[in-house]
Amino acid sequence: MSDIKDGNNDHLVQSDDPEHPANLIPALCRNFYSHGWVTGTGGGASIKRDNHIFIAPSGVQKELIQPHNIFVLSFPTPKYPPSARQYIRKPLKLNPSACTPLFLAAFERGAGCCIHTHSQWAVLVTLLVEREKGPEGCFEISNIEQIKGIPRGKGKGMMGFFDTLKIPIIENTAFEEDLTQSLEEAMEMYPDTYAVLVRRHGIYVWGDDVAKAKTQCESLDYLFQLAVEMHRLGLPWVKS
């Protein structure tokens, strides 16, 4: 790990540009908090810019995060062990996000931003899928306009109204970092996916850039809420 001294590399998170990752992450977290996605310090966000990874800290109320709370990693960097990760800025008295290796898994696949939320709708659809399809089932929905907000895959354009969206679901673990292997396996099994649900936990969503990751996260949450209501009304998620 890099030798980080007090105050070293603070310039990496100091900018008047609202589009700078150190300013965007607090803004995103405040937005997500207003949706109820990152309550109780849960969830997080990370942005890749050039060879730097900017990551929200662990254990800080997401609506209160400030630029000086942001961690910065050199990229590429090892996912494991944590001691091998190359932090070039590490705020005093704060811990790195437990989501870090999962964010890195998304960046290794070309993402520019990765978001983790504890959305209640995401949690509920994982339970409904488990009850209806068993633990190996994935979330599927079709013939809903908002599906157009989700990419078909890298360089394949956006999904259409008649397409069936599929989001893999992995089982939760006692510790966040232990989800990494299952997340990567889901990415391999569903190479075109931009999201992975975690049963009884939430969702990881990534995109080519911040705007795409944010709008895809919003579109998915809309679809999950709609799916829960459709199920309550006895309506199928996939139109035959």
From Swiss-Prot:
Its EC number is 4.2.1.109. GO terms for biological process: L-methionine salvage from methylthioadenosine. Substrate binds at residue 99. It is found in: Cytoplasm. Disulfide bonds: none annotated. Pathway: Amino-acid biosynthesis; L-methionine biosynthesis via salvage pathway; L-methionine from S-methyl-5-thio-alpha-D-ribose 1-phosphate: step 2/6. It catalyses: 5-(methylsulfanyl)-D-ribulose 1-phosphate = 5-methylsulfanyl-2,3-dioxopentyl phosphate + H2O. One of its GO terms (molecular function) is methylthioribulose 1-phosphate dehydratase activity. InterPro entries: Aldolase_II/adducin_N, Aldolase_II/adducin_N_sf, MethylthioRu-1-P_deHdtase_MtnB, Salvage_MtnB_euk. Binds 1 zinc ion per subunit. PANTHER family: METHYLTHIORIBULOSE-1-PHOSPHATE DEHYDRATASE. Catalyzes the dehydration of methylthioribulose-1-phosphate (MTRu-1-P) into 2,3-diketo-5-methylthiopentyl-1-phosphate (DK-MTP-1-P). Belongs to the aldolase class II family. MtnB subfamily. This is Methylthioribulose-1-phosphate dehydratase. It comes from Paracoccidioides lutzii (strain ATCC MYA-826 / Pb01). The lineage of its organism: Eukaryota, Fungi, Dikarya, Ascomycota, Pezizomycotina. The gene is MDE1.
